[in-house]
């Protein structure tokens, strides 16, 4: 019996195969991978630390309200999702016209990571984008100061929250300590924040501005799509 020196009795070394990543079409066609709305909501609740099945409600948004969260229905682009920086359910329409709801849990430069049935699938944005017409749903947590519009001339804790959150985002404080008055300097900062997030720069802290500000409120429990540098946080 012949053999290479020093190899007698050595166990065979197996090289593991690189796992094959299924295409988006294969994922959508797989009956074992649910793409219904409830499954997407269940995955989204998990990202926020909640068990979807433990709550009652006709819709996912009704269940979200029970834990103090709100639904945000919007139509936008990948850039909008990056700015929002929250996991989001996107609606895809396949070539047969069937609608699928999938949870996006991460965005990098060229790829989106989808969470389906507990498995993560990283797919090119260009592939997902062919079936995505911009519709998405995200959850957000309103600030403790409430959801009422905040505007120039107002005073109170809600104004201080706006100042603190803008400072956390990276805009310089205009008063020290933080003033309770919403003055013209703060209005200018709100407009700058709105422009950077492609919002109407009216200086009014309404729903959409509150939603985006909440992404920088410092809550450790809120899930994010990407790291601060990837999200464009200054």
Report each predicted region and the residues it spans.
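Noncatalytic regulatory segments and standalone regulatory/sensor domains
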Residues: 29-33, 45, 85-93, 111-172, ...
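Structured segments of extracytoplasmic/periplasmic soluble domains
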Residues: 43-54, 78-84, 91-95, 110, ...
